[in-house]
Amino acid sequence: MDIKAYFELIRLKNCLTASFGAFIGGLIASYFNISMIDNLILASIVVFLVCGFGNALNDIYDLKIDKINKPKRPIPSKRISLGEARIFSYLLVVMGLIISMFNITCFLMAVLNSIVLQQYASTYKKNKIVGNLIVAYLTGSVFIFGGIAVGNIDVTIMLFLCALFAMWSREIIKDYEDIEGDIKEKVISIPIKCGEKSIYIAAFLLVFAVLLSPLPYLFGFFGIYYLISVIFCDLLFLIGIYNLVMNPSKKEAKKASRNIKIVTNLVLIAFLIGSLFK
């Protein structure tokens, strides 16, 4: 068995990042209550396994395209057979769902996200108008999952919403970068439908995320340290998207996409600061 090939199949780095997101979400929601560590570890394992299932499914459904565009991926390179990939993906999701039974709400959300991942891989990868929203939802949902695991989703819902709208904006900007390739692949996307106007849609979504970001302070969940930290992040968001609106080039779109990814991680740190120094 080529272990490295299986790690490539599930995109190990992505799985670890998602798993870490659930762990951090739970830490924030529990205000660093160490007695919840068992639940946090279980939640992180579930997210790792379900994320791996989704990534493996993507490669299964993309086999024809990957034979041309990514021939070194595990399945087209025949390091893993199509049948082995299917069995492995089923094992991942079954193990993830079994472990998620430590909390009935976690189990229900794991089932929901597994279905969403399957639908995304099979149906919505070429319809990015829907697919972008799915990716944004899945990105943000790991924080709620961590909150569910520790029995408190109040703060993580706000983190989820900020992440959802920021990532939704980023996905549209990425599609703007890739518009020529998507036209060739007959993909449906907002930039293909709207052209440069799609930048304004992305800007609106990002500004909405910025407007949501002070809510944990306004509702009294976090204190002034959070507010100062998140305002700094918001300024970085706004500068990046302003530059793109003023100069809607592919080069500027790439910068804006990278900026959103980096600043979203900084927002996560702001939430950690808020949880630590309430």
Swiss-Prot record:
Major location (coarse): membrane
Gene Ontology CC terms, in alphabetical order: plasma membrane
Keyword NAD: no
A GO molecular function held by the record: magnesium ion binding
UniProt xrefs under Pfam families: UbiA (PF01040)
Biological process (GO), any one: glycerophospholipid biosynthetic process
Cofactor annotation: Mg(2+)
Pathway: Membrane lipid metabolism; glycerophospholipid metabolism
Membrane topology reported for the UniProt record: Multi-pass membrane protein
Signal peptide (from-to): none
Catalytic activity of the protein: sn-3-O-(geranylgeranyl)glycerol 1-phosphate + (2E,6E,10E)-geranylgeranyl diphosphate = 2,3-bis-O-(geranylgeranyl)-sn-glycerol 1-phosphate + diphosphate
Subcellular location, record wording: Cell membrane
UniProt entry tagged with the keyword Repressor: no
EC code: 2.5.1.42
Keywords: Cell membrane, Lipid biosynthesis, Lipid metabolism, Magnesium, Membrane, Phospholipid biosynthesis, Phospholipid metabolism, Transferase, Transmembrane, Transmembrane helix
Domain of life the protein comes from: Archaea
HAMAP family, A to Z: DGGGP_synth (MF_01286)
Protein family according to the UniProt entry: Belongs to the UbiA prenyltransferase family. DGGGP synthase subfamily.
Biological function: Prenyltransferase that catalyzes the transfer of the geranylgeranyl moiety of geranylgeranyl diphosphate (GGPP) to the C2 hydroxyl of (S)-3-O-geranylgeranylglyceryl phosphate (GGGP). This reaction is the second ether-bond-formation step in the biosynthesis of archaeal membrane lipids.
Protein name: Digeranylgeranylglyceryl phosphate synthase
